[in-house]
Amino acid sequence: MPMTGFYETISPRDQQRPPIWFLRQVGRYIPQYQELKRNRSLKDFFLDTESIVEATLLGPSLLGVDAAIVFADILSILEGFSVDYRFAPGPEVSYSPHEPLIFTKDPQETFSFLLEAIQQLTKRLTVPLIAFAASPFTLASYLIEGGASRDYPKTIAFLYQYPDRFKALLDEITLGTATYLQMQVQAGAAAIQLFESSSLRLPPHLFAKYVVAPNTKLIRQIKQTGNPPISLFCRCFYQEFLSLYAIGADTLHPDYHVELPEVYRQIHSPGSIQGNFDPALLLLPQDALIAHLEAYLAPLKQQSHYIFNLGHGILPQTPIENVQAVVSCLTSISTS
């Protein structure tokens, strides 16, 4: 059963409303972000301390959210694995999955740009800072596919043809990811968000093997150092979501395929849940958006340890005014 540490870490004090933050809350939809990035390459931007700091600060300053999330990419960890990658503009990865994936022996040096950014952010922020990384299956899918994919054909074929090597790859990713996140917490991050965004492709009989088991192992390893609160975002359907209750996360964050009212009806003590408003609704005219938001929130108002977020990241074409309107609406709605 999920605990409540993540909720308590980011919950606004003395306010009877759910905590608020967004997946991909800083990105191309924000004009100030576009100005920060200008003509620089995305990879250079992700590897620059000052850029990470200034971009991360945009979330709380422009949106009024209750948490900041480190501005990085799920491929940033590949710096520690010495795997070549770039954005052209989408992610492209050069790696053979038959090769052992070995994490750097000096992660403090390899990720000094990131750790310095976190240290600076903790001094400047008035809200908690969240570190994040891809979960093992999702990062493995990027490595095998050579980038983003819709149907993950290479990944599915590889795990069937080379099951032992695929399991070893997940173990290698788990080991490096645990170190990557532990040192961010040691640098000052208050909580961790894991992203299992490729998991919707897996049929049920593979979900337990390649999502539940690796995430359980990863969370256990992370919590050996400092026991930081952890939330897991996972793209899945209802039955697969229920199986995530065994992994040891503090908060579970389903995508928009899971109906939260159904979760609360079926599970007596569901713990802390985060999500899962459809980001496509942020494209609607504001009056329609707010109507959908209020309908979405109505069955959740009496639920404890609920965190408002999206069922996926904010879309690039989203008007920033709509995101701000959502925050304004939420801060005015009592959950008492």
Curated annotation (Swiss-Prot):
Homodimer. Disulfide bonds: none annotated. Transmembrane segments: none annotated. It catalyses: uroporphyrinogen III + 4 H(+) = coproporphyrinogen III + 4 CO2. One of its GO terms (cellular component) is cytosol. It holds the Pfam family URO-D. It comes from Chlamydia trachomatis serovar D (strain ATCC VR-885 / DSM 19411 / UW-3/Cx). The gene is hemE. Its EC number is 4.1.1.37. This is Uroporphyrinogen decarboxylase. Keywords: Cytoplasm, Decarboxylase, Lyase, Porphyrin biosynthesis. NCBIfam families: hemE (TIGR01464). PANTHER family: METHYLTETRAHYDROFOLATE:HOMOCYSTEINE METHYLTRANSFERASE RELATED, UROPORPHYRINOGEN DECARBOXYLASE. Pathway: Porphyrin-containing compound metabolism; protoporphyrin-IX biosynthesis; coproporphyrinogen-III from 5-aminolevulinate: step 4/4. GO terms for biological process: heme biosynthetic process; protoporphyrinogen IX biosynthetic process. Catalyzes the decarboxylation of four acetate groups of uroporphyrinogen-III to yield coproporphyrinogen-III. It is found in: Cytoplasm. Substrate binds at R24, Q25, V26, G27, R28, D73, Y142, S197, H312. The record marks D73 as: Transition state stabilizer. Belongs to the uroporphyrinogen decarboxylase family. The keyword Lyase applies. GO terms for molecular function: uroporphyrinogen decarboxylase activity.
